[in-house]
Amino acid sequence: MCIRDRFIIVIIMAILSNLELDNKSDITRIAHLACFIVIATITVATFVQTVNMLMTTINTMGTLMQVISPFLLSVLIATGKISTTGIIQPLLLFLASSVGFIVTYFVIPLLSISVAFNVICSISENIRLEKLSKFFSNVSLWTIGVVLTVFLGVLSLETSLSSSVDSLSVKTTQAAVSNFVPVVGKFFSDSFEVVVGATKIIGKTGGIIGILGIVIVGIIPIFKITSIMVIYMLLAAFVEMITTDKLILKYLSGFVNVYKTMLGILIGVVILFVISTGIILNLVNSIVT
């Protein structure tokens, strides 16, 4: 259903609400309920489609992360970051698999419960579940925030420690080859620097391509969710001008909060993958020669 049809149905509901306030007729109540059922069906169907898009996007980014991770890890090994690779590899695999799992089996159910409570509490003023609906929506967003904070904190700490060890190992290897290998030791030491430099360039190029891929995958769903959220915000603002019915306004505002949460979750996951790839790029470029 197009945006125009949604506006028309909302206007009809607002008019019926005003008539219901003036005339307690069963016919107007039934008509109002019928319009609400139509709106609820449309909004829930849109929510389901958006959820499927969100899950597909996150799973695609996870798959992309699994594809570029072996390449970047190979670059780390080639540049002497053996200790770092041993730490980053399980963390990246955990990231790629766990984010999709958390979103699918924890975040999405919480959002679905939030939407269900929003629909139920909008049927009658005597049903008050809006606070509970907002709570479940906020918990789903907090979950992604905690995952992002903990993972990036651990990754940054571990890679900083292991990076120092690996850099020292690289310098020690160069010094040993240069000083103890007769005649050609200095040549091999200088060649090692050239190889490391070339490997860093290759790794940087691959990492940038990976970051661009993640951003491209995430940018279209971000715009779609933003547009849906703006539509509901406009509907809520329009309803507020033409009717005093708080149920319609509460219903639309509830979906605005849900889509804000979904937008925050998707942006958070994109940032998580981009920063993780950026940390690896920084490690590739931090080889001390």
Residue ranges and their predicted role:
Residues 1-3:
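Short, small-residue-biased leader/transition segments that mark boundaries at the very start
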Residues 6-11, 38, 42, 69-72, ...:
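Residue-level signal for the membrane-embedded core of alpha-helical transmembrane segments
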Residues 16-22, 45-55, 80-91, 121-129, ...:
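Transmembrane helix-loop junctions in multi-pass membrane proteins
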Residues 28, 32, 42-107, 121-136:
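Membrane-interface helix-loop-helix junctions at boundaries between adjacent transmembrane segments
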Residues 61-68, 99-106, 136-150, 195-198, ...:
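Loop-to-transmembrane-helix entry motif
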Residues 163-201:
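Membrane-interface interhelical connector segments
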Residues 186, 190-194, 231-289:
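Transmembrane alpha-helical segments and their short flanking loops
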Residues 205-247:
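Helical hairpin unit composed of two closely spaced alpha helices linked by a short loop
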